Amino acid sequence: MGIIVISTVYLLGYKIGTYFVLGYMLFGYMLNSYMGASSNSISKKLKRFEREGILFGRGALYLGIGTIAVLGFIDYLPLALSMLIALFISDAVATIVGIGRKTKLPYNKNKSILGFIGYFGSFAIAAYLFIGIYSIPLGAALALIESISIIFDDNITIAIAGIILYKIISFI
C-alpha cells in the first residue's frame, strides 16, 4: 500500500495525488469497517494480526491520520514524499527487522537496536532520492522519535515531528 500511495503522489503531483490518496483512505476505512464488523473467513484471518483487546484496524487508522496530516501540512513535495516513506516503509522495516530481537535500546526495552538501525537505514536510502544528504539527519531524528515510547502511536508522532521540522526549516 505504501508504494501505491508514494507513487500516486509522485506521479500525479502533490495536489491531485493527495486527492487520490484521500480516496484510498476513505475506501480503506470503509473496507476496514466492513471487515471489522464481518465474521467471514478473511476478516478472521486479518484479525489475527491485531493485538488482543485492540480495535481491529487501529494501526491503519493511525497511519491514515499521519498520512493526511503530512499531506495537509507539508506542501514541499520532496519532503512530503520522504515523510510518506517514513510512515509506510521505514516503520514497517523497523518492525520486521526488530521484532523478537534480544538487544534492546537502553531507553526503551520494547524496541530493538536492529529495528532502530533498520528504520534509519531504510529512510536514509529511500529518502535520499528526494531530499539528498538531508535524509541522513532527518532519518536519525525520525528513528529516535519512532523508538521513544510515548502515549501516542508512532505513526502520529512521526508525522507531527516531520511537520514541526518542516515549519521550523521553512522559517529559516
Regions found by a protein language model. Give the residues of each.
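Charge-lined substrate channels and their catalytic hotspots, especially those that engage the 3′ end
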Residues: 27
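Interhelical loop and helix-boundary elements at the membrane-water interface
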Residues: 1-20, 30-129, 133-172
